[in-house]
């Protein structure tokens, strides 16, 4: 039996429940706690059925058990408003926080673009940007590594059913955090993000549009090659990530049209926005877990 790093999840909503399914397949991560605030929550009930310990008393219900249960990595899938306090409490117990809210108090992580940069930095909080950011920033980065991007704009369209109450409360944070990461991680000088929640029924698959204004005449061949290379990188952990059209060149504008189909772990396959977020978080946590298991990373209580 390979040793695994024990994890806890805060937030038993759409994202937390989908992430739980992914962690159970991980070779190096073992989910042991699910934390919520509603004793009747479907996510807590599902976690209990899987034999995972649960509390409906929020983070304060988890903290006393973290050391005894050996929890070293905690995922926060709640809301930007409560994340800072959650992170402070968890870090004080010497556990690493992976933030799936748009709070962004820690550095951004978009695995195919900058996961390797986080190795060896002993960070105690990393932020997974947003679902729209995880889907589109790799494409902005694919263009910006070929030539400078003066402006990057993304439009993420998600089905209404896949956007839970936490996502809806965080729309402003979504746009701000995603725009910031388009600049910091994607490499655009100026970023803008738009989210559209589509109420169509049956629900539509996640769709993303990426526009980049490059400086000078676009190097079509190099940009196209870079986009296809990046596509393959994302598909390693999100197989349903597809390039529907593009890159389309119009003057100095480069446009890419994407579709993200999920694995259907919790919500059906149209909810690719859950998948890309949870798969990226699991991938990031696995990298930290591998470092801990190899003795290269020792977590210190904050």
Swiss-Prot record:
Cystines in this chain = none
User: Does the keyword section mention Nucleotidyltransferase?
Assistant: no
Record-annotated active site: 131
Coiled coil, from the record: none
Task: Give the EC class as a word.
Answer: oxidoreductase
At which positions is NAD(+) bound? 162-170, 273
Write down the EC number: 1.2.1.10
Does the record's keyword annotation contain NADP? no
SMART domains registered for this protein in UniProt: Semialdhyde_dh
InterPro entries reported in the protein's UniProt record: Acetaldehyde_dehydrogenase, Acetylaldehyde_DH_C, NAD(P)-bd_dom_sf, Semialdehyde_DH_NAD-bd
Which reaction does this enzyme catalyse, per its entry? acetaldehyde + NAD(+) + CoA = acetyl-CoA + NADH + H(+)
Give one Pfam family.
Semialdhyde_dh
Q: Which domain of life is it from?
A: Bacteria
Q: Which HAMAP family match?
A: Ac_ald_DH_ac
Family assignment? Belongs to the acetaldehyde dehydrogenase family.
Instruction: Report what the protein is called.
Output: Acetaldehyde dehydrogenase
Q: Give the taxonomic lineage as stored in the record.
A: Bacteria, Pseudomonadati, Pseudomonadota, Betaproteobacteria, Burkholderiales
């Amino acid at each position: 039996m390979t040793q695994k790093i024990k994890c806890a999840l805060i937030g038993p909503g759409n994202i937390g429940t989908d992430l739980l399914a992914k962690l159970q397949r991980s070779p190096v991560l073992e989910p042991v706690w699910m934390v919520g605030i509603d004793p009747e929550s479907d996510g807590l009930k599902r976690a209990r059925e899987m034999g995972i310990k649960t509390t409906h008393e929020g983070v304060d219900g988890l903290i006393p058990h973290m050391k005894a249960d050996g929890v070293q990595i905690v995922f926060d899938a709640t809301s930007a408003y409560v994340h800072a306090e959650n992170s402070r409490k968890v870090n004080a117990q010497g556990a690493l926080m992976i933030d799936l809210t748009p709070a962004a108090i820690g550095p951004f992580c978009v695995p195919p673009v900058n996961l390797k940069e986080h190795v060896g930095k002993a960070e105690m909080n990393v932020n997974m940007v947003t679902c729209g950011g995880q889907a589109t920033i790799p494409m902005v980065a694919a263009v910006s590594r070929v030539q400078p991007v003066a402006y990057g704009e993304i439009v993420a369209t998600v089905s209404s059913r896949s956007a839970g109450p936490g996502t809806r409360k965080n729309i402003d944070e979504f746009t701000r955090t995603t725009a910031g990461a388009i600049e910091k991680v994607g490499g655009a000088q100026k970023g803008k993000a738009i989210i559209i929640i589509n109420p169509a029924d049956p629900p539509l698959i996640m769709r993303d549009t990426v526009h980049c204004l490059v400086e000078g005449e676009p190097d079509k061949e190099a940009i196209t090659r870079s986009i296809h290379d990046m596509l393959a990188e994302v598909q390693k952990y999100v197989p349903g990530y597809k390039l529907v059209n593009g890159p389309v060149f119009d003057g100095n504008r480069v446009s890419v049209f994407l579709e993200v189909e999920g694995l259907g772990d919790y919500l059906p396959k149209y909810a690719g926005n859950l998948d890309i977020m949870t798969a990226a978080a699991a991938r990031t946590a696995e990298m930290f877990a591998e470092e801990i298991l190899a003795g290269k990373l020792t977590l210190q209580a904050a």
